[in-house]
């Protein structure tokens, strides 16, 4: 079973109903799988911090939601997480493809991507890096359980050892 199939299963098993996303090459197969599955309502957002608002509204309306994006985009959410989600106890799950580390060719991805776990720690958003494709479903379920039981955001960073990496065009 691929990491994508496992992630979809983990989302379903934890009653995630809404997916907010920004397209990216690496996360696109997961986004497409969610869009093709009737279990999810998908919402394309123009900026990642808008997803925090969409998912906060979903929670207030009785739905659980998840954000799918890449790590450089996740950095755009920090103000919304710090000023809305954290103080108002509005949970969501982030499934984020990690850029800026192993296999990275784009220097612009390194600044926030390489340091993303520490940056999330600095804004008090719990996070976990997933390095092994074999346990994606379990990690998604565990992260969602933590996020929704504690009413706080939780981010899973999907490492390139799971997702593969984006190769430089020549």
Language model features: what each stretch is:
Residues 1-170:
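Thiamine diphosphate
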